[in-house]
Amino acid sequence: MPVHIRSSSIALFVCTISLASSVGGQQPPQNWTHFVRIGAYGLSPSNSEKIVRDATTTHVFGIEVDNDIPGRYESFLDPTEKLAAIKAVAEKAHQAGNKAFVYIAGTECITANAEKAPHSVVKDHPDWLQRKITGEPAVFTGGAAFWIREGDEDVWISPYAQPWRKQYMERVRQIAATGIDGIYVDIPYWMTHFDGWEDSWASFDEYTLAAFKQKTNLDARKDLKLGDFSDPNFRKWIDFRISTFTEFLREIRDNARSINSSIMVIPEIYPGIEEEVVRVGADVYQLYGVVDAVAHEYEFGGGDHMAGSRSQLDWFLYQVGLASFRAFAEGKATWLLNYSWDGDKNVDAREAMKTLAASEVMAGVNFWDAPGHSMAGSNDAATRIEIFRWIERYQNALYHARTPFHPVGVYFSPASRNYDAAHFLPSFRGTVLLLLQSHRETQIVTPRTLASFNGTALILPDVSQLSTIERDELKAFMDRGGRLFITGSDVTKFPDSPTIARSASSLGSNHLSRLEKDFMKASQSLQLELLASLPPDSGLRIEASPYVVSYVAKVDGKPHFYLSNFAGIVPHQNVRPTPESATRIVVTASPNATLTFVPFLGTEQTLHGEHSGDQLIFHLPPFDRGAVAWLNDSK
């Protein structure tokens, strides 16, 4: 029998995108990146018209074209032919009322048939290469990754190799001059993600060593205890490596915008909120501040990451990641290149596509459909058209700016994640999961948004690192009536106060541990001590199964509700959720208020509420994957 949770609020997932505008700030205006329905295509000198025609027919808006200039050494040296193709597809896209963006690699560069080629990076510029501390260069060939062919030379270049960087930025400016709408920068990484390089903490090439020496007066080969997160000098190495790619992306955008003031720069990044960020050196929290949107090829942990292979807990953990990305974005767009199906005979690819899409769009994230682990094409073209048509019809409800009501905040501390991931991450994820499953309105708060957070309570889940600025902003939050809930680690140094509640135990970690042991049992017996002590909110709540994730936000002046359902999912067997049939929305509203209800891939239904005092209770029709609803004529 389904378990339903009564709550005084709703897990608010996406409202954080508009936090800056809710208190004293201005949210960036929306643009085409907020409304993309992405399809990808290989670009040649002769197929731009065909690409745009197919995109139009299949309801693609936001055409990705793969025509990498700096990531292929031949075109890095001479980009003439590829630049002409990019210009052609941009013109065709604009004629059709569409937008196009072009793929380029970050620090990876491939030379085809390198042994026979007169030039390659290794032959011409071996000093450019990233290196292990032993001096081993980051050079690979076929088999190192699925996109590298036999005989190809695959290298990873130091972003501090100034001759390369100067030419790279020239290529960026040339691409911007074609009129293309966006530059999609893939894999701007330190080489730590191929076999044998996971613990390298690269790079120790001469260019990088010199830059670190200039910044810190430290010799990275001698003055660090690699892998020791308690070592202050290693922490400087962590910060240096992350800031390197933040500034690299900033420079790409500055160069592109110097030629085309409206061009968008969108990096593709696979690390999300987890410890992989620290190894790879690409931190989406930092990157959102210097680019126009982020495309997340988001995955964590082991496994194949396909929608059809995810457990219920996996789906919920992905939701925590997406919630975090929307908080980091502060009004910018979040794209997601996740994968639905790759040949699993026990899973219907169409069902996997639909469940994946629903889980993303309800979170305010733009859906990118792709087959297997590739970027272009689809596992089922007809299903993609069905999904894209529905998204297009309801794009305003899905993607217009969302603002919060009265959320409980959960603090995401990048420094705690960077230096103490083993304690912070389980606590953070578990806390958010508990709130999501209990249908409390929740907002992820970051150092950039702490000063403007206007919720009633803020939870610090095993936050082990706080700057002076953060402490001052926490004090200001309490001074304006907010309550602080500190669980696990406590480095605030605040004296006891009626506005502070402390728990020595890590409530979030405990909840996550219970879910990992037995997801169903833990979900049906949520430990609600933390929730009982949180301030109640008023006027708005959702009652639903703990297998449903619910978000609420004000969109275009109306309360909107977003529901994602993961009941009944079994990895490699069933990816279509069991319908949820007992969800209720309870609101304080005028007697004549109605609720518009739209199930995923369905059409609008008008619901009338049941009166209970000054409240209306709306009983939602059954839905399987998800639904969006909004209140009309509320007071």
Predicted regions and their residues:
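Bacterial N-terminal signal peptides that target proteins for export
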Residues: 1-11
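Bacterial N-terminal signal peptides
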Residues: 9-20
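Boundary/entry segment of secreted carbohydrate-active catalytic domains
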Residues: 26-55
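Hydrophobic faces of well-ordered beta-strands that scaffold small-molecule active sites
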Residues: 34-40, 63-65, 100-103, 183-185, ...
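Catalytic domains of carbohydrate-active enzymes, especially glycoside hydrolases
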Residues: 45-72, 175-182, 292-294, 356-367, ...
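Acidic/aromatic-lined carbohydrate-recognition and catalytic surfaces
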Residues: 57-178, 190-194
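Polysaccharide-binding and catalytic clefts of secreted carbohydrate-active enzymes
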Residues: 134-319, 324
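Carbohydrate-binding surfaces of carbohydrate-active enzymes
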Residues: 246-264, 270-271, 288-635
